[in-house]
């Protein structure tokens, strides 16, 4: 799971949902 995937996921909303994890987009 890399920065590009996180960036693309964070475009969808304030929280990025991936298997077994949640990434708040404020980390970007």
Swiss-Prot record:
Superkingdom of origin organism: Eukaryota
Keywords: Disulfide bond, Neurotoxin, Secreted, Toxin
Subcellular location: Secreted
GO terms under cellular component: extracellular region
Tissue occurrence: Expressed by the venom duct.
Free-text description of this protein's post-translational modifications in UniProt: Contains 2 disulfide bonds.
Primary localization: secreted
Keyword Transmembrane helix: no
Keyword match Chloroplast: no
UniProt GO MF annotations: toxin activity
Record text about domains: The cysteine framework is I (CC-C-C). Alpha5/8 pattern.
Name this polypeptide is given: Conotoxin Cl1.2
Organism: Californiconus californicus
